[in-house]
Amino acid sequence: MMAADRLRERTLSVTTLAADEFHAPSLDDFFPPSVLIHAGPFELDRLMLIRLLMSVLVAAFFVIAMRSPRLVPRGMQNAAELALDFVRINIAEEILGKEQGKRFLPVITTIFFIVVASNMASIIPFLNISPNARIGMPLVLAALAYIVFNYVGIKKYGFFKYVKSSIVVPGVPLPLHFLLVPIEFISTFILRPFTLMVRLMANMLAGHILLVLFFSATNYFFFVSGGFQAIFGVPSIIAGIAFTFFELLVIFLQAYVFALLTAVYIELALHADEH
C-alpha cells in the first residue's frame, strides 16, 4: 500500500478544523491521500494539484500581461515588466554580466517565478501550504541548477579540466591538496545542490508549521476550550497575522536566494580556472 493511502489527510486550517478537537501539526498534512488519479507514477495528491495550479496561474499572469504590450506599460504589463526587470538586472546581469546574463536569463527567471508561485500558496486561503514544503519540488529545482552549472563548465573546459579547476586550489603546498581536494569536491558537487534543496524546503516547512500552529491554537482557544482560556486566542491570532506577513517576506527572499545562488554557481563554473 502506498504511503499516500496509509496516511489520512488532516487540513489544519481554521476552516476545516474539527469543532470538538485540536490537531497539532503532523506529517499527515504533507502526505495527503491521492485525488483524481489514485495509483501509478502519475498519482495526484493535494500538494501536486497546488503545484500545478500555481504553475498555471503564474504562466497565465505573464501571458495575459504581455498579450497586447504597450510602449508605455501600465496595469498588469507594468507589474510583469517590473518583476522581469528585477530578475534580469538584480540577479542575472548583476552576477553574470549583460552578455552571460542574457544567455541564462530564461533559466534564472523560470526558477525565480516557480519558487515564488509555489511559495505563495502557503498564505492563500484554502491552499495553506507550499508544495516546496515537501522535498519533491526543491529537489527538482536544485537538480536543474546543478545540471545547468555543471553543463556550462564542462562545455567550456571539458570534463576533466572543469573538475580539476573546481576542486584543485592553486598555489597551495602539495600535502594540503590531500585535505583541500576532498573538501572542495564535497562543497562543489554535493553541498551546492543539497543546500539549495534543503534551504528552500526547510524554510517553507517551518513557515507552514508555525502558521498552522498559531491559527489552529486560535481556533481552539476561541471555539473549543471555552471559559477564561478564550483570552489566549487573542495573542495567538496576533502572532499568526504577524507571521503571515513574515512568511510573505520569506516567500520572496527564498526565491531571490535560490535564483541568486544559481547565477553564482553558473558564474563560478564559467570561470572555474580563475578560482
UniProtKB/Swiss-Prot annotation:
Ordered alphabetically, the record's keywords are: ATP synthesis, Cell membrane, CF(0), Hydrogen ion transport, Ion transport, Membrane, Transmembrane, Transmembrane helix, Transport
- Domain of life of the organism in this record? Bacteria
Q: From which lineage does this chain's organism come?
A: Bacteria, Bacillati, Actinomycetota, Actinomycetes, Mycobacteriales
Q: Which HAMAP family match?
A: ATP_synth_a_bact (MF_01393)
The places in or outside the cell where this protein is found are: Cell membrane
Membrane topology reported for the UniProt record = Multi-pass membrane protein
Stated family: Belongs to the ATPase A chain family.
A Pfam match is ATP-synt_A
Per the entry, what this protein does is: Key component of the proton channel; it plays a direct role in the translocation of protons across the membrane.
List the InterPro entries hit by this protein, alphabetically: ATP_synth_F0_asu, ATP_synth_F0_asu_bact/mt, F0_ATP_A_sf
Q: Which GO terms describe its cellular component?
A: plasma membrane; proton-transporting ATP synthase complex
Record-level Gene Ontology MF annotations: proton-transporting ATP synthase activity, rotational mechanism
Q: What is this protein called?
A: ATP synthase subunit a
Stored SUPFAM superfamilies: F1F0 ATP synthase subunit A
Q: Which residue ranges run through the membrane?
A: 46-66, 104-124, 135-155, 166-186, 204-224, 231-251, 252-272
Q: Which organism is it from?
A: Rhodococcus erythropolis (strain PR4 / NBRC 100887)
Which PANTHER family does this chain map to? ATP SYNTHASE SUBUNIT A
Assembly description: F-type ATPases have 2 components, CF(1) - the catalytic core - and CF(0) - the membrane proton channel. CF(1) has five subunits: alpha(3), beta(3), gamma(1), delta(1), epsilon(1). CF(0) has three main subunits: a(1), b(2) and c(9-12). The alpha and beta chains form an alternating ring which encloses part of the gamma chain. CF(1) is attached to CF(0) by a central stalk formed by the gamma and epsilon chains, while a peripheral stalk is formed by the delta and b chains.
